[in-house]
From Swiss-Prot:
GO cellular component, one term: cytosol
EC number: 3.1.-.-
Protein function: Could be a nuclease involved in processing of the 5'-end of pre-16S rRNA.
SUPFAM superfamilies: Ribonuclease H-like
Localization of this protein: Cytoplasm
Name of this protein: Putative pre-16S rRNA nuclease
């Protein structure tokens, strides 16, 4: 049986990043990993965390949430993610795919709220859940915005 190369997803913010990884057997579903908090705009910390995950898990694709406005146009956050994407490409050899993340955090919060956990736990888990939603979308559709 051939080894499955996993996928990892990131939901990047200015002070936190959610990570999710695909399952090791079939790449058919996403597993939330963690919400990683860092100093505002210190994206080198995110790169270092991704290097940690690269050692821990073998993955061949990095899925990066791409925040577009509801109209489909780019925003200030879109430009931030594009700059981070350039940093990823300089650092990693894996395929990098941008995936439209509109409403992913809203959906993640709603899903977590349904589990009756506290607001502080929702805040703690929302980004990794959003990353899992992005990754599930990619795994189910194999579509990216570029």
């Amino acid at each position: 049986m051939a080894k499955v190369m996993r996928k990892i997803a990131l939901d990047l913010g200015t002070k936190s990043c959610g990570f999710a990884i695909s399952d090791p057997i079939s790449n058919s579903f996403a597993i939330p990993l963690e919400n990683f908090f860092f100093e505002e705009n210190n994206f080198k910390k995110v790169i270092n965390k991704l290097k940690h995950y690269e050692k821990k898990y073998e993955f061949d694709t990095i899925i990066l949430g791409y925040p577009l406005r509801m109209t489909g146009t780019r925003s200030e956050r879109s430009i931030m993610v594009e700059e981070f994407e350039k940093l990823l490409r300089k650092t990693f050899s894996q395929r990098i795919v941008l995936v439209d993340e509109r409403l992913s955090t809203v959906k993640a919060k709603a899903m977590l709220k349904e589990t009756n956990i506290s607001q502080s736990k929702i805040k703690e888990k929302k980004d990794s859940m959003a990353a899992a939603l992005l990754l599930n979308y990619y795994l189910n559709n194999f579509l990216g915005v570029r």
